[in-house]
Amino acid sequence: MRAWEEFLLLQEKEIGVDTVNKWLRSLKVLCFDACNLYLEAKDSFQVTWFEEHIRHKVKASLINNNGKPIRVRVTSLDKSTPFKETQIQQEKTAYFTMKYGDIDPNMSFANFLVTPENDLPVRILQEFAKVSEQGKGFPFNPIYLFGPESSGKTHLMQAAVGGLREAGVKTLYVTSELFTEHLVSAIRSGEMQRFRAFYRNVEALFIEDIEVLSGKGATQEEFFHTFNSLHTEGKLIVISSTFAPGDLKAMEERLISRFEWGISIPVSPLIREGLKSFLERRTEKLNIRIEETALDFLIQALSSHVKSLLHALTTLAKRVAYKKLSHQMLYQGDIEALLHDVLQAAESIRLTPSGIVRATAQYYGVSPESVLGRSQSREYVLPRQVAMFLCRQKLSLSYVKIGEVFSRDHSTVISSIRAISQKLEEDDRECDVSRAIQELTKRLSSAYQSLDFIED
């Protein structure tokens, strides 16, 4: 049909010919009337891709000769495909033996350093464990924890999960990425009923990094119904994210609204004194003695990055034990000698173009590949321009070098960077681009940044 073909040609310009051929032209046109187009996909995964990437474009661009929107209905061919009973059973077994979030026993409340900055989330999560022991309902639901990388969100989540499980509460702990993987597996194997039972027949659901669902319409739809089912039955939902609910990008408003139903709690990274106290406690447990100025040196050398410091102390403890120095006070010279390789590696850690691309992609809720890709869709063009601007600003790379990173000629790079500069020169601090640059600059320069954003 003509309208569908015109739509496909438009998409070739936005997302590329190869993508259209793979995902859209392979859809079979079953039937068309004035306002309805019926398509058949080869499998459920193609249906999911259509819903997440194309559905919103159809609503905006596909119209008939009378200017009325055409409703597109996509069904899956594999719904009617026969399977052998043994094959079905194998798929069920494979899907439901997937891991679903083991917790680290060391991540307990007892091992968490409570400071004035993070006292509130600790007290609330501990109180919830007590409430569950008494068989009472949860006073705030959901609990939404948000804060930068290395602020302790995972530690708090796992500590709370451990406490609830000890109290006999059936608790499921997953990352948003794992939730998405489970959903895709369920769709592909026709096991949505079992998927829903798996996620809803619990008393508490803990889900990390909810921003991973950004831009994934079909996954958000399923999580919306999962959330509603649990909340209606008074079951606890605990969510973590780098962003406050209102700052989530490409997330449905109805989900954001529900995230704000209960209580949203910021989780702050340890300030320097708190970090030092935390590390002093850790050295006692590891049975090593470090002179105060030597510990200050180590904190400075590793840029106050908590995970790097914990790794360094664990390595130091092993080497101290090997050299039988457990009772000896360690000074800066000893630290430099015993951790020479660790400190040398830390010096080589630097911000890179690929690190900027990953950080920008995460901020906008898209993949790094799409930022580096050829699509001219606005949802990818803007992150690409922002990443180019940051490469120029933060790394002082030449236009030619940036062009090599993004597989573009230098004139395209110049125009992209100029476009972002012009938006910033408008002096509107509330504009989306200005907020993006400010937030990404903060993340990339923060002493508590995640090593996901840097490479050695």
Swiss-Prot record:
Pfam family, one: Bac_DnaA
Region entry Domain II, spans: 68-101
Positions of region (Domain III, AAA+ region): 102-320
UniProtKB keywords: ATP-binding, Cytoplasm, DNA replication, DNA-binding, Lipid-binding, Nucleotide-binding
Region (Domain I, interacts with DnaA modulators): 1-68
Superkingdom of origin organism: Bacteria
Location of region: Domain IV, binds dsDNA: 321-456
GO terms for MF: ATP binding; ATP hydrolysis activity; DNA replication origin binding; lipid binding
This protein's record includes keyword Nucleotide-binding: yes
Gene Ontology biological process terms, A to Z: DNA replication; DNA replication initiation; regulation of DNA replication
Keyword set includes Cell membrane: no
Gene3D superfamilies hit by this protein: 1.10.1750.10, 3.30.300.180, P-loop containing nucleotide triphosphate hydrolases
Principal subcellular localization: cytoplasm
Location relative to the cell: Cytoplasm
Binding sites annotated in the UniProt record for ATP: S150, G152, K153, T154
Role summary: Plays an essential role in the initiation and regulation of chromosomal replication. ATP-DnaA binds to the origin of replication (oriC) to initiate formation of the DNA replication initiation complex once per cell cycle. Binds the DnaA box (a 9 base pair repeat at the origin) and separates the double-stranded (ds)DNA. Forms a right-handed helical filament on oriC DNA; dsDNA binds to the exterior of the filament while single-stranded (ss)DNA is stabiized in the filament's interior.
Quaternary assembly: Oligomerizes as a right-handed, spiral filament on DNA at oriC.
PANTHER family on file: CHROMOSOMAL REPLICATION INITIATOR PROTEIN DNAA
Name under which the protein is recorded: Chromosomal replication initiator protein DnaA 1
Originating species: Chlamydia trachomatis serovar D (strain ATCC VR-885 / DSM 19411 / UW-3/Cx)
Gene that encodes it: dnaA1
